[in-house]
Curated annotation (Swiss-Prot):
The active site is at residue 50. Pathway: Carbohydrate metabolism; D-xylose degradation. Induction: Overexpressed during growth on both D-xylose or L-arabinose compared to D-glucose. Significantly expressed during late stages of infection of barley leaves. It comes from Pyricularia oryzae (strain 70-15 / ATCC MYA-4617 / FGSC 8958). The gene is XYR1. It holds the Pfam family Aldo_ket_red. This is NAD(P)H-dependent D-xylose reductase XYR1. The record marks 79 as: Lowers pKa of active site Tyr. Catalyzes the initial reaction in the xylose utilization pathway by reducing D-xylose into xylitol. Xylose is a major component of hemicelluloses such as xylan. Most fungi utilize D-xylose via three enzymatic reactions, xylose reductase (XR), xylitol dehydrogenase (XDH), and xylulokinase, to form xylulose 5-phosphate, which enters pentose phosphate pathway. Belongs to the aldo/keto reductase family. Gene3D superfamilies: NADP-dependent oxidoreductase domain (3.20.20.100). Transmembrane segments: none annotated. Keywords: Carbohydrate metabolism, NAD, NADP, Oxidoreductase, Xylose metabolism. Its EC number is 1.1.1.307.
Length: 324
């Protein structure tokens, strides 16, 4: 079974169901990527900050060497970290990331967060994380503007280092500003999206502007409990939420499939992950069946406006209220 594709605004076809690589441990990452390719996944969503791009590339190489897939059949996504936003830093770090993956180009490259931090040389610490110092106490902003960074991103397309470019964790006002000066429009926006954080107006804004939305953390608090976030622990896990469980029974699916289909049926791409082959295959079936419109609305009504993936939820800071 192949994932259906979504047409990006540059004509590129992007698989609607991909495989996320956040928190995939280095020790198993190569095998996880290889097994995901065997299970049918073709889009892999990585990032500098995940710290596992070398191992991701090893899994891809193994699959290609064994004839399971060709490079051109894969859709590999990566992201620009905050410490590389200065215009002259963008291309060098992309080339490093490509070398880590062992590939010549990305299919899609995103600005990870709309936050510019002071440069940390990869030879000093990589991935650099949010803090300038090794002790993890000092946040140092860079003076790079989003426009400066985006101009450098556009040059990646010109140089053939990425086929498409986009953004992640941006809000509508930043997107509207970008569209005033962008020579190459962002092809996608990647956002935290689950029934506890629907962001429907942002999704509608992207649809109007021809920007495809990719949902991450589709299972909500399940991805964040290990960080001891009180609000993640206080909420009913979405995989156990009575509304979701009831709909899973109604459609003969598991709760994870219901959560993913809620997104894909509304026109979003998804990037779930699992190290278990059974769950890999289950998550891949987030398309090919439909729920009634009333059930889609019932899931959306669970919205609480609760966001998990913001810096202040990971460490104490008064400087990084990105979504304020």
């Amino acid at each position: 079974m192949a994932s259906p594709t979504m047409k990006l605004n540059n004509g590129l076809d992007m698989p609607q169901v991909g495989f996320g690589l956040w928190k995939v441990e280095n020790s198993v990452c190569a095998d996880v990527v290889y097994n995901a390719i065997k299970a049918g996944y073709r889009l892999f969503d990585g990032a500098c900050d995940y710290g596992n791009e070398v191992e991701c590339g090893q899994g891809v190489k193994r699959a290609i060497d064994e004839g399971l897939v060709k490079r051109e059949e894969l859709f590999i996504v990566s992201k620009l970290w905050n410490t590389f936003h200065d215009g002259e830093r963008v291309e060098p770090i992309v080339k490093k990331q490509l070398a880590d993956w062992g590939i010549e180009y990305f299919d899609l490259y995103l600005i990870h967060f709309p936050v510019a931090l002071e440069y940390v040389d990869p030879s000093v610490r990589y991935p650099p994380g949010w803090h300038y110092d090794d002790a993890g106490t000092e946040i140092r902003p860079s003076k790079a503007s989003i426009q400066e960074t985006w101009t450098a991103m556009e040059k990646l397309v010109d140089a053939g280092l990425s086929k498409a470019i986009g953004v992640s964790n941006f809000q509508a006002q930043l997107l509207y500003d970008m569209l005033r000066y962008a020579r190459i429009r962002p092809a996608t926006l990647q956002i935290e999206h689950h029934p506890y954080l629907v962001q429907q107006r942002l999704i509608e804004a992207c649809k109007t502007e021809g920007i495809v939305v990719t949902a991450y953390s589709s299972f909500g608090p399940a991805s964040f409990k290990e960080f001891n976030m009180e609000h993640a622990e206080a909420l009913t896990p979405l995989l156990e939420e009575p509304t979701i469980v009831k709909l899973a029974e109604k459609y003969g699916k598991d709760p994870g499939q219901v959560l993913l289909r809620w997104a894909t049926q509304r026109g979003l791409a998804v990037i779930p992950k699992s190290s278990r082959e059974k769950t890999m295959k289950s998550n891949f079936e987030a398309v090919g069946w439909d729920m009634e419109d009333s059930d889609i609305k019932t899931i959306s009504a669970l919205d609480k406006g609760i966001r998990f993936n913001q810096p202040a939820n990971y460490f104490s800071t008064d400087k990084l209220w990105i979504f304020g």
